[in-house]
């Protein structure tokens, strides 16, 4: 698993400090963008409330619980910047779970774009090119592990 530079860690921690305290509203911004990029992803969410539209999903308590979980994964990554390998098993398993429910790996890129969108909207002028790159570096590490788990789960099903 790759490592981040000390500068990347500093930028990520500094930007997450305020965002991490208010996870759900920031997560809603992120998922709103995700559903703009790929409305078909709405069909993957099966809750008591039908996620036929972005607004249906974003007003569903069950979906907001999912948003919270996603934001907690980001929080865990930020909290473990000095020891990202400690998250590897968790991320591999997360990739397996996403493969099992029909998420394709292309969607990981759209989630990354949505994360950057949320950061830009939330941070305003504090969102700089170096900060964007630092988050991209972290996200690429997270996605690499999730993609391995995703692929492994697909291989297991093929056997």
Swiss-Prot record:
Enzyme class of the recorded protein, top EC level: oxidoreductase
A single GO cellular-component term on record: mitochondrial matrix
InterPro entries: Globin, Globin-like_OT, Globin-like_sf, Globin/Proto
Keyword Phosphoprotein carried by entry: no
Chemical reaction(s) catalysed: Fe(III)-heme b-[protein] + nitric oxide + H2O = Fe(II)-heme b-[protein] + nitrite + 2 H(+)
Subcellular location: Cytoplasm, Cytosol; Mitochondrion matrix
Binding site for heme b: 66, 98
The family this protein is said to belong to: Belongs to the globin family.
Role: Monomeric globin with a bis-histidyl six-coordinate heme-iron atom through which it can bind dioxygen, carbon monoxide and nitric oxide. Could help transport oxygen and increase its availability to the metabolically active neuronal tissues, though its low quantity in tissues as well as its high affinity for dioxygen, which may limit its oxygen-releasing ability, argue against it. The ferrous/deoxygenated form exhibits a nitrite reductase activity and it could produce nitric oxide which in turn inhibits cellular respiration in response to hypoxia.
Protein name: Neuroglobin
Source organism per UniProt: Dissostichus mawsoni
Lineage: Eukaryota, Metazoa, Chordata, Craniata, Vertebrata
């Amino acid at each position: 698993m790759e490592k981040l530079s000390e500068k990347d860690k500093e930028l990520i921690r500094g930007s997450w400090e305020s965002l991490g305290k208010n996870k759900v509203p920031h997560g809603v911004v992120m998922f709103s963008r995700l559903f703009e990029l790929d409305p078909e992803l709405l069909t993957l969410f099966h809750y008591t409330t039908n996620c036929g539209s972005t607004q249906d999903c974003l007003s569903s308590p069950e979906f907001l619980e999912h948003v919270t979980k996603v934001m907690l994964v980001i929080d865990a990554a930020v909290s473990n910047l000095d020891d990202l390998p400690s998250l590897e098993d968790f991320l591999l398993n997360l990739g397996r779970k996403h493969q099992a429910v029909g998420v394709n790996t292309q969607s990981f890129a759209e989630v990354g774009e949505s994360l950057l969108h949320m950061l830009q909207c939330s941070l305003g002028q504090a969102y700089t090119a170096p900060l964007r790159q630092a988050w991209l570096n972290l996200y690429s590490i997270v996605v690499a592990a999730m993609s391995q788990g995703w692929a492994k789960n697909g291989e297991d099903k093929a056997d």
